[in-house]
């Protein structure tokens, strides 16, 4: 059964519509990621006033960006420090691009789960903002927990940052990052389809894809020297590297949705049906 589901998912990923949706998600994800990080760093710098939280975010970025992490971190921090109006611009851009991320995903999910109708434009806007806010809260909670863990370890170890401190903080950060990823996948699969989807039917897929996404990131970073983007794209290699990883992430999101739709027979409920389940092939 597992082999059958896996082959079914792989066949779906070879379809042109899957690649179209993934590229659309990738483009808007890149456009929304940096405004989101600017807002997050601004909150840390100007509301929480926490250097520990900033260090945690920097480590998050080093773990999740495939290349030129220090350059990106410095650029984001300089934006927050030097431009006061950038926060409002970031909010506006984030509102626009978050819709661009979730709109193609909703259409793709509705096809995967067999829901006939998509939401209206305003309905999708509302759900997109809700999901963007929820993902932002998840990220902020992860940062706060990681910073609290680092602060507690410093107290326990009397301020000494030795190898034990480094290993424990790194392990905690990776666990929190993976948990945050799982939470985001779960929210996408549960809320975004235009129909009632049972939480238990998408949770296993969200857990699997959250873990696979973290592993895939390391595999992608390992493969970068062989891809050799700088030789082909020159000064645009950073953007291409991020875009390619965003595209792969988009395909992984769609793969998880395909697996979730098959995980529990009759997992989805149409809006018109309160108690009847439909079987999705």
For every predicted segment, state its role.
Residues 1-281:
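Membrane-embedded alpha-helices and immediately adjacent juxtamembrane helical segments
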